[in-house]
Amino acid sequence: MPKQVIIPPGTTTPIAPFVPGTLADGVVYVSGTLPFDKQNNVVHIGDPKAQTRHVLETIKSVIETAGGSMADVTFNSIFITDWTNYAAINEVYAEFFPGDKPARFCIQCGLVKPDALVEIASVAHIGAPT
């Protein structure tokens, strides 16, 4: 089955050669998502909760555009710049995954823009198209 490019309406033009998501064989692959506005500027500078919420809302829009929901997420890759933000990021993360949690990992690293505190990439299994 060929892949389908997923670009939600009003999505920011990426700053590198990639798309927000792809769908193949009922699996949505969401690119690493940063807390960017439509001009690729970091939003909510210094606020890990607001940045995490922005990132997860963006991921949600990609998955919903593909026909799924956040309940379909099976794996997240989380990148944070400072472990002191870990609890705040997890607090917001739990709001988006209230039931069965997806598998994930979380590492501390530098991100592409210094004011970004969190980046998340996701995988969601939405099943065969109807």
UniProtKB/Swiss-Prot annotation:
EC class of the enzyme, as a word: hydrolase
InterPro entries, sorted: RidA_CS, RutC, RutC-like_sf, YjgF/YER057c/UK114
Family annotation (Gene3D superfamilies): RutC-like
Gene Ontology CC terms: cytosol
EC number: 3.5.-.-
UniProt cross-references to SUPFAM superfamilies, sorted A to Z: YjgF-like
Reaction catalyzed: (Z)-3-aminoacrylate + H2O + H(+) = 3-oxopropanoate + NH4(+)
Similarity section: Belongs to the RutC family.
Role description: Involved in pyrimidine catabolism. Catalyzes the deamination of 3-aminoacrylate to malonic semialdehyde, a reaction that can also occur spontaneously. RutC may facilitate the reaction and modulate the metabolic fitness, rather than catalyzing essential functions.
HAMAP family noted in UniProt: RutC
UniProt-listed PANTHER family: 2-IMINOBUTANOATE/2-IMINOPROPANOATE DEAMINASE RIDA (PTHR11803), PROTEIN HMF1-RELATED (PTHR11803:SF58)
Descriptive protein name: 3-aminoacrylate deaminase RutC
